[in-house]
Amino acid sequence: MSDLEKKYSKLIEGIITHLGDRKSLSFSELSNLLPDDILEPEILDCICSVLEDRGIRLVNKISELDLVVSEDGNDEEEEVEIESDRNFMILDDGFQSDEEDIDIDVKLDDCDEEDISVKDDLGSGYIKGNVLKDSHSEDPIKLYLKEIGKEFLLTGNQEVELAKQMDSGESIIENILKNEGLVIENYYNLVNTIYSRMEREEFFKREKDKDKESSPDYYNKKKRIASFYKIPLKPIQDRLISYVDNKHRVYDLGGDIFEKNLKKERLALKELLRDIPLYQEELRIFSDDYIDSANKIKDLQRQQRIILSRLKIEKIRDLRVLGRDLTIAEKKIEIEKSLKLKEDAIKEQITEAQLAQKELERIEMYYEYPTDKIISMSEEIAKGKQMMQHAKDQLIKANLRLVVSIAKKYANRGLHFFDLVQEGNIGLIKAVEKFEYKRGFKFSTYATWWIRQAITRSISDQARTIRVPVHMIEQINRLNRETRYLIQVLGKDPTDEELSDRLGWELKKVKTVKSVSREPVSLETPIGEEEDSVLSDFIEDKAIKNPANHTSFVVLQDQIRAILGTLPEREQEVVKMRFGLEDGYSLTLEEVGLHFNVTRERIRQIESKALRRLKNPKKTQKLKDYLEDLN
């Protein structure tokens, strides 16, 4: 008997006692019976061997591949076919991959419910009391793998059921928003975003305080909304704008927003808006806004109840009576004595309650429903969101092991394994949100592409100190592969010319790719034999502006502004936006066209006309002196 057999003999005897007359054991059940700190393959193999020697048949084979995350970073991906029980607690590599064709097929053996046991069913006092104690491992990866191993795998039918549940939740939300006309104001805001010219000066003033990379965000948002909603909303945009403007005008004048003409127009718009698609992003934003408004109503009503209780009145309209009584000296003294509050404190409470009431009326005007109805509909929307979220969570948790199996293929490529897993999980979440079960594909097949995309994208974005684009990464990998091949063939490092011939690239391209592939060097790298200096001591600090150049640049800006001032206002705006003269960000023809609500061709014509005017020798002569400095 080996040392391991002696050490775990009591554990093995406890397992055999638990089985009784049974002669078979699934690995899912064995995993439940074993203590959490047993993860080493040698111990598991020893236990399995002893059980097999005792005549107990094991359903599946445990291999070291299932227990230890592979550190092998090979580019070649092996095909692995896994059969696992639904409750299989050990991490399985259920990923079968090929560069051209990817197919995931996780087969689920039928599990007998009687074969699934938990630790509470064990009969051995030793196993209960000692062996099955929780082991608080300090390794987060082991803990994570252990936790995701507890999640059930899903059959194809279960995946479809969860996808249907997500659709049902989304339908509940969309039906409430559309059928009740809650999105009229939201569609009005979309129309304004699409067709109105933005406050450009205010926008650039706001963006100057931020990172310049955030400047295109507004245009990207406007472009997305325009592509989705511009054509569907165009036939009704005038009626929509007219109705909402009239409603706000009536409300501001203290009129009734539920009067006959407005109500009739609202019903007509509600019917027209039902046929307009509501995309997932807007569905999420609109429903969140509605739930936030309902929560705000609850907070305001709670605030009012507290104030009314403090002032010992029952209804909001009694606040005016209380306010008038405070102007009468005799009643004021009586009220202060009754409420045990000073006049200023009472007036402050009245003002707060009235402001809360005004905000409640504004929300009622916005959604055109009383507050009680808004709250009840928000609860239905919340149920739909909860239904969607529950189905998403189930689908995500059941496929976390798929993410790990794919992430293992990308180990040792510049990112920690756990980071790869988390990036893959982000891809999995996107796959769940975009999964269309009606197309007939298994979810694992669909999700694989999203997971791999997320992982490879994160490697290209984060693995290097300086980000290298994905297409350049592919060229670097190809260059390295051919370099290794030529070293084997030639017995020496290949020259750039030999690599150029082998790859069919121009010599310049080979040199460019090699320069990009270089790793950055630390500024703290010691320099010299005595290493008394560092690399940063020999690098010019270009952050410090040259006073002469800075002054020249400021004067140049003034000259450009003066010359642009001779152009018509619209041509000035186009030139500034096209060449980034305001914020340093040059806009495309399409982006400028979105701003002015004209075609890109019209913007090109305006730009050409403006540049022809600027080529006037009297204007260009002032700028020629700066060309030499710029060059």
UniProtKB/Swiss-Prot annotation:
UniProt-annotated stretches for the region Sigma-70 factor domain-3: 474-550
Predominant location: cytoplasm
UniProt keyword Magnesium present: no
GO MF terms, alphabetically ordered: DNA binding; sigma factor activity
Region (Sigma-70 factor domain-2): 395-465
Family per record: Belongs to the sigma-70 factor family. RpoD/SigA subfamily.
Natural source organism: Borreliella burgdorferi (strain ATCC 35210 / DSM 4680 / CIP 102532 / B31)
Motif Interaction with polymerase core subunit RpoC: where in chain: 419-422
Name of the protein: RNA polymerase sigma factor RpoD
DNA-binding region: 589-608
One GO cellular component term: cytoplasm
Localisation: Cytoplasm
